[in-house]
Amino acid sequence: MKLLVMLWVLAVLPCAADEAAIRAAVSKSLPLIERSSKIAIEERSNCFTCHHTGLPVMTFVTARERGFQIDAVNLQTQLDFTVQFLAKGRENYLQGKGQGGHAFTAGSALWTLKLGGRTADATTEAVTAYLIGHQKELHHWKPPSIRPPSEESPFSATFFALESLRSIPAATQRLADARRWLEQTPAQTTEDRVFRLWALHAAQSDSTTAARDLLQTQRDDGGWAQLENMASDAYATGTALVALFRTGSVKADDAAFQRGLSWLMQNQHADGSWHVVSRAKPFQKYFESGYPHGKDQFISITAACWATTALLLALPVVP
């Protein structure tokens, strides 16, 4: 009987993802993200976006830390573009108006610069002051529009704002208010659970229960789904894995993390991409960014950035 139990346990435990296979998956994905991020700046030179600027920067920085050769010129171009975008709106930030996307754009742009190692200046100080005052009565931040899955949750907007304000002395009360809101407000979707976990960690609050809630929604196939009635996809799986790892809720060799990695590698397309079907209603003019999957390319590159970053986190940092 004991032997049967041991065999059953061995059967259901995932094999550790092979480092060579992970590197191969990343090596196929990175060129697609790099190419598309370059094209997007040329096509939409007046607009910072998470899907073609912020998240690619996250991926490039993480890849560089793991010993991958990245296009350093493109990385600096993305960071310079973010600086210039915020600088164009500096007066609006000083007046409390912000830019399109409001707190979500402001917070994610500052997060992007932080990832890229850029230091504070007069423009970023204006943006942080805007975030401190914006939506203060809510005790959290929320996006101005509902564009699922990546721009619909108040938890994601709150996370990006907290990451930008956590070291700002003038934001102490705002951070305390947000911490209480996070502790008292339940998550409804995977996007909520992912960013509630990350935001609680950023707010230096206990995130143990939030991590458990996210882990409990992992599917039998190893992935996560955006909603209960949807199948597992690369966006939900990638965001969940990155948040769990970055908050210290799991280690790279934990079974849940390994199962998620396996799902990502099994569902990567032969060309190195991942395909996620868009749920957001288009409101901007369509343009071809060079990433596969046509009208689904914006959410697909978003998913690819999270998925690639999750795979990278399983690899050792190269000194």
Where are these regions (language model features)?
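Bacterial N-terminal signal peptides
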Residues: 2-12
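Preference for long, amphipathic alpha-helical scaffolds in soluble/luminal domains
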Residues: 14-319
